[in-house]
A protein has these predicted regions:
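Long, low-complexity segments enriched in small/aliphatic residues
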Residues: 1-75
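Long, contiguous, secondary-structure-rich segments that constitute the structural scaffold
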Residues: 53, 73-89, 93-200
Length: 200
C-alpha cells in the first residue's frame, strides 16, 4: 500500500471507489440476511456461549506431520499417533475432571458423530477447548457407529459461514470426551489394515 499511501489519487486501489472500503455496496446489493455490507459478528450456531449439552470447544487445526490427509501413513504421522489414533490435546483441568491421563484412548462425541482419539494433556490449550488435527484417514465402523482413527469431520457441522462466502464452519463445534469402552480398543484404523472397512 506504500504507493497508495504516498499518492492515493494517482495510485488508486482496485475497488469501486479506488480507496480502502469498509462498506461494500456490491455485498449490500445482494440483500443477504446473514452477510452485511460491512464486517459484523453473528452468533455462531454452536459455541461455548450457547452451550446446552456439550462442554468442550473443538478446534480442528491443520496437522503438523502431514498435509491434510496426505502422508497420514508416513513415518512422521504414525510417530505422532497415540495407539494408532490421532491425538486429542486437552487442558489438564478438563482432563482431571474426566479422570484422563496421557495416552488414554477416548471417545470424542456430539450429536453428529463419534470418533476415537488418544489423549495428550497440555497447558498449550485453554480450559474448555480441545484440539484434534484434521487429516486422519477415515476409518468408520457401521456396527459400532464410530470412526476409529480420529477424523474430526464426523463431529463438525455442514453449515456455511454465510450464504455469500459458503466457507466451512468447522471450528464452530462443541464436543465432549470420555474414556473409551473396552469394546472399541481393538478397532483397527485404515492406514494399518483395510480388511475391516464396510463401505458398501
Amino acid at each position: 500500500f506504500e504507493d497508495f499511501i504516498n499518492d492515493p489519487i494517482s495510485n488508486k486501489l482496485n475497488t469501486s471507489s479506488g480507496k480502502i472500503e469498509i462498506v461494500s455496496k456490491v455485498i449490500k446489493s445482494f440483500k443477504l440476511k446473514d452477510c452485511k455490507k460491512h464486517p459484523f459478528w453473528f452468533e455462531p450456531y454452536e459455541w461455548i456461549g450457547n452451550k446446552k449439552r456439550f462442554n468442550l470447544h473443538l478446534i480442528s487445526n491443520q496437522p503438523e506431520f502431514k498435509l491434510h490427509g496426505q502422508l497420514d501413513n508416513a513415518f512422521l504421522s504414525k510417530l505422532n499417533k497415540i495407539k494408532n489414533r490421532e491425538p486429542l490435546i486437552i487442558n489438564p483441568i478438563d482432563a482431571k475432571k474426566r479422570k484422563l491421563k496421557n495416552n488414554d484412548l477416548v471417545e470424542v462425541y456430539n450429536q453428529r458423530g463419534r470418533m476415537l482419539a488418544g489423549i495428550r494433556i497440555s497447558n498449550k490449550v485453554m480450559e474448555g477447548v480441545v484440539v484434534v488435527s484434521t487429516g486422519s484417514w477415515f476409518s468408520p465402523y457401521k456396527k459400532e457407529k464410530i470412526e476409529a482413527h480420529g477424523n474430526p469431520n464426523v463431529l463438525t457441522g455442514d453449515i456455511p459461514t454465510s450464504s455469500f462466502s459458503q466457507a466451512p464452519t468447522s471450528n464452530t463445534t462443541l464436543v465432549d470426551v470420555k474414556k473409551i469402552s473396552e469394546d472399541y480398543k481393538n478397532l483397527k484404523t485404515l492406514i494399518y489394515d483395510f480388511s475391516h472397512l464396510e463401505l458398501n
